[in-house]
Amino acid sequence: MANRLKEKYLKEVVPSLTEKFNYSSVMAVPKVDKIVLNMGVGDAVSNAKNLEKAAEELALISGQKPLITKAKKSIAGFRLREGVAIGAKVTLRGERMYEFLDKLVSVSLPRVRDFHGVPTKSFDGRGNYTLGVKEQLIFPEINFDDVDKTRGLDIVIVTTANTDEESRELLTGLGMPFAK
């Protein structure tokens, strides 16, 4: 069974993007390549339990086991040594990616307090979009009673679009609520 958002992409978004940007081939139409979820846990240096809890929450949100990220360099000011575990990340592709994007757009983002749309300035110039979430409680999988501390996470949506304009049209077509 194909995902609802993937069907919407194939039936509605591809024809509208082809019409707007005059693509010669269906393969030239931009698509979402992958979604990377990253949770930096700065206090993991002093308490390793915080990193375990963050990785557990990231696994619940994404439905996939996260990769523990380690410090590349030692930074004395942060009491950080090279090779110490300081975060967790997950890369979503295929069905899980579409499921997560659908859930993010239709369930999670509307649960944000005082939500007026996601900022339009978060494109990187190459057609990728980065979104910061201040607390993990907006995701329905996270049980409010089990949370010891609110943690934010970064969501990077990598697309095959060449420009920010194409990427924005793609994400708008998929239902991303951009601020007016």
Swiss-Prot record:
GO biological process terms held by the UniProt record: translation
Q: Where are the transmembrane segments?
A: none
The family database entries (Pfam families) matched by this protein are listed as: Ribosomal_L5 (PF00281), Ribosomal_L5_C (PF00673)
Q: Which GO terms describe its molecular function?
A: rRNA binding; structural constituent of ribosome; tRNA binding
Q: Which UniProt keywords apply?
A: Ribonucleoprotein, Ribosomal protein, RNA-binding, rRNA-binding, tRNA-binding
Please verify whether the record's keywords include RNA-binding.
Answer: yes
The record's function comment reads:
This is one of the proteins that bind and probably mediate the attachment of the 5S RNA into the large ribosomal subunit, where it forms part of the central protuberance. In the 70S ribosome it contacts protein S13 of the 30S subunit (bridge B1b), connecting the 2 subunits; this bridge is implicated in subunit movement. Contacts the P site tRNA; the 5S rRNA and some of its associated proteins might help stabilize positioning of ribosome-bound tRNAs.
PANTHER family the UniProt entry points to: 60S RIBOSOMAL PROTEIN L11-RELATED (PTHR11994)
Q: Member of which family?
A: Belongs to the universal ribosomal protein uL5 family.
Name assigned to this protein: Large ribosomal subunit protein uL5
As recorded in Swiss-Prot or TrEMBL, the protein's gene is named rplE
